């Protein structure tokens, strides 16, 4: 049983060098790991030789003459002391080597576009007929260059989601929430509460019908499990730690759902294992100062429905495509125009071998914005968490995949921009209406500004 990164380190370290180059990361730590592994293997060879020599001596002691026996016992003791020393050396070498290897990113897929940052992300397909305000036409044409995307040109300016929700509809309040908890928090009221619940039910219903098991996970995790699902050296600033406790609030249900199978071994007929998680998500949004400060698009707390797959290694590419297709179905039914983007090598997180983003069209901003992130993490997480596949005695690491199905606050933001009318009312997508009809107080077909209600 071998981890892809460790196997490459020993068989062809140039694979790892090239992987780091393609990710625009430094090579120095890798060279250190190669040297440590060389010393470790030399020490293992020496240790095995010493153990074999000690065993030979121990076997000869009972047959030796009394005078010779004492010398053999002395030699066996000396070898034993050397074995103990080498075992300590091996432990230190393996700890330092493995610490470096644990920081190594997943081997990226050959289909990933190469580039240092998000500017090199590659759109691969578009869906829908976006409403494009005349003032945003140039921006839209730039973002759809190379694709023949049909659009509807409009001569009025939709309100941005923040103003629509807080000023026009008056059903979100980030000011009061800010006084209570600080920036990037919010209150939802009335119809927007019902809309959020309908979105959750819609996504859970749709994904579970595809064979995914619904799960509500713990909302906190211990550090040693978090180390298994993310590169905590870079991610720790993004999550909340409980003061005085070895616990972190989860940033997504992906993390506890993947960690749920830590130490488990699957048989071939037990895979794929499919889950759809529902949880609040807590994020510091470190490094986003000044970005999306208004509204509920980028917040510290939100609810998300997440898809998780544990698969055989040879099937993970198939499941990666299925996961993004599931997300596309959701946003097609919500009638949100979108594009699918293949994320560039330099913009990938350490755990992902390949990632797609689904970016929804926001008419008021004139931009496609991220709504879904869909990653194939290959054996990066399973190695750390020791999640294995047993093929009739031959063991290997499973592959793990994750994808947003629906994040409520961003989806609400997309709905109020794309389904907004000139009078400020918002049409509710037909796909959500059956989840609202059962509640007497819930809106059914539209969300109406308070001023319009008072006039009527």
From Swiss-Prot:
Sites where the protein binds ATP: 283-285, 299, 370-373
EC number(s) given by UniProt: 6.1.1.11
Pfam family, one: tRNA-synt_2b
One Gene Ontology CC term in the entry: cytosol
Keyword annotations: Aminoacyl-tRNA synthetase, ATP-binding, Cytoplasm, Ligase, Nucleotide-binding, Protein biosynthesis
Binding positions for L-serine per the UniProt entry: 252-254, 306, 404
Subcellular location: Cytoplasm
GO terms for biological process, alphabetical: selenocysteine biosynthetic process; seryl-tRNA aminoacylation
HAMAP family: Ser_tRNA_synth_type1 (MF_00176)
Self-association and partners: Homodimer. The tRNA molecule binds across the dimer.
Job of this protein: Catalyzes the attachment of serine to tRNA(Ser). Is also able to aminoacylate tRNA(Sec) with serine, to form the misacylated tRNA L-seryl-tRNA(Sec), which will be further converted into selenocysteinyl-tRNA(Sec).
NCBIfam families in the record: serS (TIGR00414)
Protein name, entry field: Serine--tRNA ligase
Upper taxonomic lineage: Archaea, Thermoproteota, Candidatus Korarchaeia, Candidatus Korarchaeales, Candidatus Korarchaeaceae
């Amino acid at each position: 049983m071998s981890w892809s990164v460790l196997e490459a380190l020993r068989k062809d370290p140039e694979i790892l060098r090239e992987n780091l180059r393609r990710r625009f990361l430094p090579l120095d730590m890798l060279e250190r790991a190669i040297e440590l592994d060389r010393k470790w293997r030399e020490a293992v060879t020496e240790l095995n030789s010493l153990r074999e020599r000690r065993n030979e001596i121990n076997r000869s002691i009972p047959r030796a003459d009394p005078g010779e026996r004492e010398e053999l016992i002395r030699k066996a003791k000396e070898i034993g002391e050397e074995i103990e020393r080498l075992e300590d050396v091996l432990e230190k070498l393996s700890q330092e080597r493995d610490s470096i290897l644990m920081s190594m990113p997943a081997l990226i897929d050959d289909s990933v576009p190469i580039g240092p940052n998000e500017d090199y992300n590659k759109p691969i397909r578009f869906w829908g007929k976006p409403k494009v305000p005349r003032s945003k036409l140039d921006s839209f044409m730039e973002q759809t260059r190379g694709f023949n995307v049909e659009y509807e040109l409009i001569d009025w300016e939709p309100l941005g989601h923040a103003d629509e929700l807080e000023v026009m509809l008056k059903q979100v309040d980030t000011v009061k929430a800010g006084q209570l908890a600080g920036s990037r928090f919010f209150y939802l009221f009335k119809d927007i509460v019902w809309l959020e619940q309908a979105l959750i039910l819609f996504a859970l219903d749709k994904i579970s019908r595809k064979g995914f098991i619904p799960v509500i996970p713990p909302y906190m995790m211990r550090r040693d499990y978090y180390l298994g699902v993310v590169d905590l050296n870079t991610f720790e600033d993004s999550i909340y730690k409980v003061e005085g406790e070895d616990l972190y609030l989860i940033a997504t249900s992906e993390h506890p759902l993947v960690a749920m199978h830590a130490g488990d071994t699957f048989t071939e007929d037990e895979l794929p294992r499919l889950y759809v998680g529902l949880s609040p998500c807590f994020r510091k949004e470190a490094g986003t100062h000044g970005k999306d400060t208004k509204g509920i698009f980028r917040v510290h707390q939100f609810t998300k429905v997440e898809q998780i797959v544990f698969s055989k290694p040879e099937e993970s590419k198939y499941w990666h495509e299925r996961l993004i297709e599931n997300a596309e179905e959701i946003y097609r039914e919500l009638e949100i125009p979108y594009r699918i983007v293949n994320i560039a090598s330099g913009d990938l997180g350490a755990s992902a071998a390949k990632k797609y983003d689904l970016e929804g069209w926001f008419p008021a901003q004139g931009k496609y914005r991220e709504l879904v992130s869909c990653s194939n993490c290959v054996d990066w997480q399973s190695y750390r968490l020791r999640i294995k596949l047993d093929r009739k005695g031959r063991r290997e690491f499973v592959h793990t995949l994750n994808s947003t199905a629906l994040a409520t606050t961003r989806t609400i933001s997309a709905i109020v921009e794309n389904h907004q009318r000139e009078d400020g009312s918002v049409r509710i997508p037909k796909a959500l209406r059956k989840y609202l009809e059962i509640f007497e107080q819930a809106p059914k077909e539209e969300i109406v500004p308070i001023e319009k209600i008072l006039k009527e």
